[in-house]
UniProtKB/Swiss-Prot annotation:
This protein's UniProt keywords: Disulfide bond, Ion channel impairing toxin, Neurotoxin, Secreted, Signal, Toxin, Voltage-gated sodium channel impairing toxin
Domain LCN-type CS-alpha/beta: 21-83
Propeptide cleavage-removed residue intervals: 84
Compartments where found: Secreted
Coiled-coil region list: none
SUPFAM superfamilies given in the database record: Scorpion toxin-like (SSF57095)
Family: Belongs to the long (4 C-C) scorpion toxin superfamily. Sodium channel inhibitor family. Alpha subfamily.
Organism annotation: Olivierus martensii (Manchurian scorpion)
Protein name: Toxin BmKaTx16
GO biological process: defense response
């Protein structure tokens, strides 16, 4: 029984687990992508692997693109300054 658990755990680690999150997609230097239209953000987000995206009006970082189910390998806006 222990061997079965260990083999299952090893297979899980070998295949990897990719998680997703909802967040503002970030440009280099921790800046959001400014927006005016939902279509722009949806295109940007889906091209980067997200399920969808929209323009978050007057949000925490102004008018920025918010992505739903964005992969972990894509940078997101984190607390702190945008260094343009």
């Amino acid at each position: 029984m222990n061997y079965l658990v260990m083999i299952s755990f090893a297979l899980l680690l070998m295949t990897g687990v990719e998680s997703v999150r909802d967040a503002y997609i970030a440009k280099p230097h921790n800046c959001v992508y400014e927006c005016a239209r939902n279509e722009y953000c949806n295109d940007l987000c889906t091209k980067n692997g997200a399920k969808s995206g929209y323009c978050q009006w007057v949000g925490k970082y102004g008018n920025g693109c918010w992505c739903k189910e964005l992969p972990d390998n894509v940078p997101i806006r984190v607390p702190g300054k945008c260094h343009r």
